From Swiss-Prot:
EC code: 6.1.1.10
'KMSKS' region (motif): residue ranges: 348-352
Ranges spanned by the short sequence motif 'HIGH' region, renumbered to the chain: 27-37
The organism of origin for this protein: Burkholderia multivorans (strain ATCC 17616 / 249)
Entry protein name: Methionine--tRNA ligase
Length: 722
């Protein structure tokens, strides 16, 4: 099925049973699952559950991405074999996905015999098709570790701007890209040795072949996301531009992965066998369940195939992967859905602030996984926009929507129905206008989910919940219960409320599967599907005793979560001479706990402020930062906008009032010191994610000048100042 057929297929969903294969990107097997990862898995899981509730044959497939140099080196560092490491990490990842209700039909590993066979089969088919080329290339080689070095395992001086400590493929200061062999004064990140240049035969997938370009131009027209289509067209260029480059699909020994057939000492690059791992995991499931694997993945298959990914790996999934499949005799993806990144409280996740939150720490702290599923769903739509986890909003929204609006409906009605009416609903109440309105809304809500417009689905659902609560408030069952003469009205009110609650639970089931399961047990009904909107509660089936379905989010739980993920300042404070220093409780806590000092009180030795305790100092997280970009702020005569590398996954944006002292180009490439745990501040010009430190005289008029702090060479981004 082509991507352009998606709309007609979706329109036919209620009539025909579809065969649908769905994947999420494979987590790399050298680290923990964190909440940034969970955005994708929760997004995919909601979509999969939506389709299952239509009765379609849906398989949700995943695996750990296990091959490559980083896994090999980490295993060596931990004194393990690579296989021992990936087995341990697999168990951790599976535990985390299970905790958050991610309903994989199979979660496997790319280090499997199925993946080896499929990778070899695809490679040999591409070779037979004239799409594999052999070339001698020159690479950096570590003479100490006796291994060729991937681009990211070499650092040195940028050949363009001469910035130090730049990676082997691109400069973070000037943005230039280059070959690793062009790097000046290079060194191995693995051993510190100076790499030597060595030639080696490598194997390339000929993506530049006109056949690939022609195919991709046609295939891209069916992508559902305009942003993805535009990006693909940018990569492809105009017809005749020949912008596509061949792709190096091989790596030299030592390497943890699959050896290329007929090429001893050469291994498939991880990005070749990783997407093939989708099929390998599915084949493992098919072999165990008796499913016809070939019928799903062969060219021309009527089955649908969807990949959910982060926007940072769009290139691999919309260029290499579909071309590999097309020219190896397989079906191509029906569509690829990319999502944006996650920020926390308006800033990128940070270990120092405790917002680099792991899945396991969330569970260990006692937070309900369905709270996060709901919050992410409320923020997600069909675009590639980034989403923000605002922790205050998280608490408020979960408490208001799920507890205050949704769960509250059942708790207000169930007791009366059990006590007064033997737990049996009034059958005539199932035709109440409010119930009819909710029932009619279910198909639209389901359509929003299938279109990946989860925010719309939940807004619609909560609007209906508001109407149900307004109905209960108007009927006042607690007042009706005081007079036996109101028994019929009380029975109707409770019955309408509980049928409305059943329909709301149906609407929320893709997002809150465990709550839905508890609701099904409460009503004594079979697992809810979309068709069950037309199957109301019946007096023939009494409800069970009501069990509380969800608690409120407590601010203390969030504080504990941040503390669990924050780099401890205890050791640093003690090393500085303070005994019994307390661990900081986050930027907000630090701000709240800080004791004000008098600006008028002169301190000893002419210092500007009164003394502070070592505990107070321990709350401030000072870090080395590299200024990778700098520009003047339009509309401000004081501010410069700095882009800082603080040793985290992403750079930080900081506005600093030092424009009078520096030209932007003077600062690029310099190291400085920043306050890393200062709460992000929304400014007229954007969000500032910290503060850089600068010195000035007490009397700036008599002695003007601003001087940013510069550490000695040898300091690196992310190092703590202590």
């Amino acid at each position: 099925m082509s991507a352009s057929d998606l709309t007609s297929v979706q329109a036919a969903a209620p009539q025909g049973r579809r065969q649908i294969l769905v994947t999420s990107a494979l987590p790399y097997a050298n680290g923990q699952i964190h909440i940034g990862h969970l955005v994708e898995y929760i997004q995919t899981d909601i979509w999969v559950r939506t389709l299952r509730m239509h009765g379609h044959e849906v398989y949700y497939i995943g695996a750990d991405d296990t091959h490559g140099t980083p896994v090999m080196l980490r295993a060596e560092k931990e004194g393990l074999t690579p296989k021992q490491l990936i087995e341990r990490v697999w168990a951790e990842h599976k535990r985390d996905f299970d905790s958050f209700g991610v309903s994989f039909d199979n979660f496997y590993s790319t280090d499997s015999e199925e993946n080896r066979q499929l990778s070899e089969k695809i490679y040999l088919a591409l070779k037979d098709n004239g799409l594999i080329a052999e070339r001698e290339i020159e690479q950096a080689y570590d003479p100490v570790k006796e291994m060729f070095l991937p681009d990211r395992f070499i650092k040195g001086e940028c050949p363009k701007c001469h910035a130090k400590d730049q990676y082997g493929d691109s400069c973070e200061v000037c943005g230039s890209t280059y070959l690793p062999t062009e790097l000046l004064n290079p060194y191995s990140v693995v051993s510190g040795a100076t790499p030597v240049r060595k030639t080696s035969k490598h194997y390339f997938f000929r993506l530049s072949d006109p056949r690939c370009e022609t195919f991709l131009r046609e295939w891209v027209s069916g992508l559902a996301q305009p942003e993805a289509t535009n990006k693909m067209r940018e990569w492809l260029g105009d017809a005749g531009e020949a912008k596509l480059a061949d792709w190096d699909i091989s790596r030299d020994a030592p390497y943890f992965g699959f050896e290329i057939p007929g090429a001893p000492g050469k291994y498939f690059y991880v990005w070749l066998d990783a997407p093939v791992g989708y099929y390998a995991s599915f084949k493992n499931l098919c072999d165990r369940k008796g499913i016809d694997f070939d019928a799903w993945i062969r060219a021309g298959s009527s089955a649908e195939q969807y990949h959910f990914i982060g926007k940072d790996i769009l290139y691999f999934h919309t260029l290499f992967w579909p071309a590999m499949l097309q020219f190896s005799g397989h079906r191509t993806p029906t569509n690829v859905f990319a999502h944006g990144f996650l920020t926390v409280d308006g800033a990128k996740m940070s270990k120092s602030r405790g917002t680099f939150i792991t899945a396991q720490s969330y569970i260990d702290t006692g937070l309900n996984p369905e709270w996060l599923r709901y919050y992410f769903a409320a923020k997600l739509n069909a675009t590639m926009e980034d989403i923000d986890l605002n922790l205050d909003d998280f608490q408020a929204r979960v408490n208001s929507d799920l507890v205050g609006k949704y769960v509250n409906i059942a708790s207000r009605a169930a007791g009366f129905l059990i006590k007064r009416f033997d737990g049996r609903v009034q059958d005539s109440a199932m035709n109440h206008p409010l119930v009819a309105k909710l029932r009619e809304a279910i198909p639209q809500i389901a359509a929003h989910y299938e279109a990946r417009e989860y925010g719309r689905a939940l807004r619609h659902t909560m609007e209906l919940a508001d109407e149900v609560n307004a109905y209960v408030d108007g009927a006042k069952p607690w007042e009706l219960a005081k007079d036996p003469a109101n028994a019929v009205a009380l029975h109707e009110t409770c019955s309408v409320s509980l049928e409305a609650f059943r329909l709301l639970s149906l609407a929320l089931k893709p997002v809150l599967p465990r709550v839905a399961e508890a609701v099904e047990a409460f009503f004594g009904i079979a697992p809810l599907a979309w068709a069950d909107a037309a199957k109301p509660l019946s007096s023939a089936q009494p409800i069970k005793a009501y069990q509380h379905l969800m608690t409120r989010v407590d601010a203390k739980q969030i504080e504990a979560l941040l503390a669990a993920n924050r780099d401890s300042l205890q050791a640093d404070a003690t090393a500085a001479g303070g005994a019994g220093a307390a661990t900081a409780k986050g930027a907000k806590a630090a701000k709240a706990d800080a004791k004000p000092v008098s600006a008028k009180a002169p301190a000893a030795n002419g210092a500007d402020d009164a003394t502070i305790s070592i505990d107070d100092f321990a709350k401030i997280d000072l870090r080395i930062a590299k200024i990778v970009a700098c520009q003047a702020v339009e509309g401000s005569d004081k501010l410069l906008q700095l882009t800082l590398d603080v040793g985290e996954e992403k750079t930080r944006n900081v506005f600093s009032g030092i424009k009078s002292a520096y030209q932007p180009e003077q600062l690029v490439g310099k190291l400085t010191v920043m306050v890393a745990n200062l709460a992000p501040r929304k400014m007229k010009f954007g969000l500032s994610e910290g503060m850089v430190l600068a010195a000035s005289a007490t009397d700036e008029k008599a002695e003007p000048g601003l001087y940013i702090l510069e550490p000695h060479s040898g300091a690196k981004p992310g190092m703590r100042v202590k």
